[in-house]
Amino acid sequence: YLPLATIAWGLALNYTMANMDFLGKYDGLMGVPPITVFGLALNDGKGMYVLIWAFALAAALAALHLLDSRPGRAIRALKSGTTMAEAMGISTFRYKLVVFVLAAILAAISGWLYAHFQRTVNPSPFGINKGIEYLFMAVLGGVGHVWGAFLGAGVVKLVEDQLQVLLPRLIGTSGNFEVIVFGIVMIVVLKYAPEGLWSFVARRFPQPARRKDWADAPPLPARSKPQRGDLLLQVQAVRKEFGGLVAVNDISFDIRAGDIVGLIGPNGAGKSTTFNLVTGVQGLTRGQVLFRGQPVGGLSSRQIAQAGMSRTFQHVKMIPEMTVLENVALGGYLRSRSGTLQAMLRLDRAEERGLFAEAEAQLQRIGMAHQMHELAGNLALGPQRLMEIARALCTDPALLLLDEPAAGLRHQEKLALAGVLRQVK
């Protein structure tokens, strides 16, 4: 709905402003003064060219810094859906809003530069056609790749200029036929290269492994832990109905600190649904869930994660484009505080070192430290499940819920998992 609402809002503003007398209607505003920098008026194209590139590179650098940070990993987690991100304590609504505002700021700066460069401004460059063209640039270059935006914009404009010359000669008539060509190209790209053109560049020139600079990083804040034997979780007559189907039928059990408890049942018995009810992914039909003596039945996944409960999932949820180390560091989100502006200005490095030190420690704990620089999407299912456990441990939970953790693991990996669970106990 958001893309459609954004397009509709843009169309409404476009037509509204095009009918306002004081804005010049469709003719727009003429005689926009040049930008003045330190008393120097940028009247020529050369000065504006330098200024535009300065803004573009500064924006790219800020975006790269942001993506390589605590809030950046939270933003990248949105691509995999909200369930995993919320379970790590991330406010998905907040970061969607952050992305929207940052995109609006960049668009506003671009419009300001455009108006002063052209010395005139009218509604046509801000209409639906241009919006679709900008979207195509992002898709072609690679959504989520900062340099992909530059590549996509360059390719689209170069090809567009050539098509505007060649197509009228081939067809024998003039028109915006390049739109049809771009539509076909977009379908081909989405089918055969959904990650965009930059993904080919990234595969050919992979990034070097992250420099290990966190050996002397201070530890992250630790959560207060219950004493062995303390009552941690109480599930009391919990029931979940989907229409007329009863998925969980009045289940009750208690878990105490230091216990390893297994929830056993055949496929479709409601085990994962029970996990979802306990962790706030789904709401209860009736019953009560108490965590450390406090009712959590009506809380969100994020609030329950803040209370000290962490989990893995039946089907592995991760960010394939990030390294194993970065995926695990996502689990330390609630144990750090750096924000968007700090990340852009690179003022969060001390905290980042602490996050990566904790992530490496948890990977060593499960025997995956040697794979920490590999892309998570390149791992087999077994290591991906172990990585999920390391991510959950990185939250420093009081209660750890593992949904089918041994599924897909080989014998030696299962033995290693059993050792980790005994150590956590």
Can you annotate each of these PLM segments?
Residues 1-218:
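Transmembrane alpha-helices and adjacent helix-loop boundaries
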Residues 279:
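Helix-to-loop junction immediately C-terminal to a conserved catalytic motif
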Residues 261-266:
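The feature captures the beta-strand-to-loop junction immediately N-terminal to the Walker
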Residues 297-298, 356, 362-383:
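Conserved ABC nucleotide-binding domain
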Residues 287-294, 306-307:
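Conserved ABC transporter NBD signature motif
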Residues 400-404:
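Catalytic Walker B motif of ABC-type/P-loop ATPase nucleotide-binding domains
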